[in-house]
UniProtKB/Swiss-Prot annotation:
The lineage of its organism: Bacteria, Thermotogati, Thermotogota, Thermotogae, Thermotogales. InterPro entries: MEMO1_fam. It comes from Thermotoga sp. (strain RQ2). Signal peptide: none annotated. Belongs to the MEMO1 family. This is MEMO1 family protein TRQ2_0860. Transmembrane segments: none annotated.
């Protein structure tokens, strides 16, 4: 089954040439972006890495996302990419894995790695084959053009989380560590925005707690802060999955808000790029 783009023309351009140019400008942005283009990949990724990446419209979060993909390229070309995104639509299964076929973007198609899907499904108590959770969801889709831009041809496993409980995060982390035994060069992307629709000062404070939990590599601290500080982070389950995978290092690459782009600091959304290795 081919999954057609749901948010091309909304979150990012629907024309190939315009999309390539916008991604280029996200990398070359010197105010919020890294100010440089990624170098061509010359090596293979040898060990698993995790990436925290935002998923708003490219005009807002694209320059922050570019930091993560610029760094990921330096580790090498992945053998497979797993993208974990939150379910914003309420459709489908609690933990939905798109099982086969390919995903289309204006830059071409990306095949689903069926062997990697099999490994995850056979080692998870919660993950299920599911198309419906992905049909209208944007959180996974917006990562794919960046992947295509920096790596060219890759294969992937899309996982959409309606259930973002600690039990699911621990379960998925265990399944992904089994996957890494067969695909050592796996790149796992946790697609998330941080605090939503509060003023700049409040969002910077709340986002700092999320950043602390990631730097501490502590999933329990993440869940504790979400409740204690009332943080409206949408993709915390994917991030908690990464924090359960025993990465030795966590590096914060860039944090900004939509207000840093638009100038409107009254209701902003926080964006973060971080890499775990």
């Amino acid at each position: 089954m081919k999954r057609k783009p749901a948010v091309a023309g909304l979150f990012y351009p629907s024309r190939r040439d315009e999309l390539i140019e916008q991604i280029r400008m996200c990398f070359l942005d010197k105010r919020i972006g890294p100010g440089e283009l990624p170098v061509p990949v010359e090596t293979k990724l040898q060990n698993p890495i995790g990436l925290v990446s935002p998923h708003a419209g490219y005009i807002y979060s694209g320059p922050v996302a570019a930091w993560g993909f610029l760094e990921a390229v330096k580790f090498g070309e992945p053998s497979v990419v797993v993208i974990i995104g939150p379910n914003h639509t309420g459709l489908g299964r609690p933990v939905g894995v798109w099982p086969e076929g390919e995903w289309e973007t204006p830059l071409g198609t990306v095949p689903v790695n069926q062997r990697a899907v099999e490994v995850i499904l056979s080692n998870s108590r919660y993950a299920e084959e599911d198309f419906m959770s992905h049909i209208r969801e944007h959180s996974i889709e917006v990562q794919i053009p960046f992947l295509q831009f920096v790596f060219g041809e890759v294969s992937m496993v899309p996982i959409c989380l309606m259930d973002q409980s600690p039990a699911v995060a621990e379960d998925l982390a265990s399944a992904l560590m089994k996957l890494a035994a067969e695909f050592p060069g796996v790149l796992i992307i946790a697609s998330t925005d941080l605090n939503h629709y509060e003023d700049q000062r409040t969002t910077l404070r709340k986002d700092s707690y999320i950043i602390e939990a990631i730097k501490s590599n502590d999933p329990r601290l993440l869940y504790e802060y979400l409740v204690k500080e009332d943080i409206s982070m949408c993709g915390y389950g994917g991030v908690a999955t990464l924090l359960n995978m025993n990465f030795k290092n966590a590096r914060i690459l860039k944090h900004a808000t939509s207000g840093d782009v638009s100038g409107d600091k009254l209701e902003v959304v926080g964006y973060l790029s971080a890499i775990l290795f």
